[in-house]
């Protein structure tokens, strides 16, 4: 990997993350790299400025923060194919990030990257678009939105909790009308986030699939469904025309959906590219360590394992 054009992103408002970002920037500049640095957070989005400022392709994005900072990087950089080195600095769970211990000797990290001594993990993304008009002549409304974890469709109100009534269609066939708090359309990566909290299945991030999960449905028969990756999921809000439904991407507000409009969710035509520094990365170990995944309450010794 060449390190000619690098962006360094730190978690907004986090002093430790900012200090590591400044150190990384200085070292990369000493190696001759052109470096752009900026904060990322709920009120800070450095990526439009980054994209408008660079004069050559971005070789690397160093993202110092937690999972939220990494998700934002994936949403903005996947379409450009930028490799992301996400490091858990100032984060909490760190499900998508490399441990800080592997980043403390940054000079050694830059050497490894230049010698291509790392693994690249590609993760499926989602894209969503709001449409209005007839099915025969749909008109796109607003932007196209991207997510690494999930798209969430649920109503919003400032003064009361609203029950959603959503109709879902898959590849042109009406599946059901859901009554509850909303619907999740997730990637395998997102299956271990909001989806698993809503009693959805866990999918390995190395596969490509969609999983649709009702949020607190008012029916015992409403169950999650796993779909082929090329499926097209369309969701209509029904009932109250005075209320709008919100589309959320990875927990961030994307746009509003009004009755008469629908949101179409499909697999994106790009993937998030995460750099893995760990020698023995294990998804199952991550589940055990980060999500406290456990089976038997009493551990038993396996005498048959060599």
UniProtKB/Swiss-Prot annotation:
Its cofactor is a divalent metal cation. GO terms for cellular component: cytoplasm. SUPFAM superfamilies: NAD kinase/diacylglycerol kinase-like. Keywords: ATP-binding, Cytoplasm, Kinase, NAD, NADP, Nucleotide-binding, Transferase. InterPro entries: ATP-NAD_kinase_N (IPR017438), ATP-NAD_kinase_PpnK-typ_C (IPR017437), NAD/diacylglycerol_kinase_sf (IPR016064), NADK (IPR002504). NAD(+) binds at residues 67-68, 149-150, 181. It is found in: Cytoplasm. The active site is at 67 (proton acceptor). Its EC number is 2.7.1.23. Pfam families: NAD_kinase (PF01513), NAD_kinase_C (PF20143). It catalyses: NAD(+) + ATP = ADP + NADP(+) + H(+). One of its GO terms (molecular function) is NAD+ kinase activity. GO terms for biological process: NAD metabolic process; NADP biosynthetic process. Belongs to the NAD kinase family. NCBIfam families: PRK02645.1 (NF002731). Involved in the regulation of the intracellular balance of NAD and NADP, and is a key enzyme in the biosynthesis of NADP. Catalyzes specifically the phosphorylation on 2'-hydroxyl of the adenosine moiety of NAD to yield NADP. This is NAD kinase 1.
């Amino acid at each position: 990997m060449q390190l000619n054009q690098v962006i360094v992103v730190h978690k907004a408002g986090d002093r430790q993350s900012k200090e590591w970002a400044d150190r990384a920037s200085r070292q990369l500049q000493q190696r001759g790299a052109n470096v752009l640095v900026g904060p990322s957070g709920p009120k800070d989005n450095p990526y439009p400025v980054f994209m408008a400022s660079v004069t050559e392709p971005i070789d690397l994005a160093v993202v110092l923060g937690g999972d939220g900072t990494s998700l934002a990087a994936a949403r903005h950089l996947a379409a450009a194919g930028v490799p992301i080195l996400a490091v858990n600095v100032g984060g909490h769970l760190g499900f998508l990030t490399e441990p800080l211990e592997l980043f403390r000797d940054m000079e050694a990290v830059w050497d490894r990257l230049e010698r291509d001594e790392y693994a690249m993990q590609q993760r499926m993304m989602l894209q969503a678009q709001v449409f209005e008009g007839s099915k025969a002549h749909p008109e796109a409304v607003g932007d196209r939105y991207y997510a690494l974890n999930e798209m969430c469709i649920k109503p919003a109100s400032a003064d009361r909790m609203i029950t959603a009534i959503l109709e879902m269609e898959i590849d042109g066939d009406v599946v059901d009308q859901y009554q509850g708090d909303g619907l999740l359309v997730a990637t395998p990566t997102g299956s271990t986030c909001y989806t698993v909290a809503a009693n959805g299945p866990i999918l390995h991030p190395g596969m490509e699939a969609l999983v649709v999960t009702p949020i607190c449905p008012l029916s015992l028969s409403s169950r999650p469904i796993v779909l082929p990756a090329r499926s097209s999921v369309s969701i209509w809000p029904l009932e109250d025309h005075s209320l709008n439904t919100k589309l959320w991407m990875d927990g961030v507000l994307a746009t509003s959906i009004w009755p008469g409009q629908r949101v179409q969710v499909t697999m994106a035509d790009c993937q998030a590219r995460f750099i893995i520094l760990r020698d023995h990365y294990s998804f199952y170990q991550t589940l055990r360590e980060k999500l406290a995944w456990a089976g038997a309450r009493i551990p038993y010794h396996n005498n048959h394992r060599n």
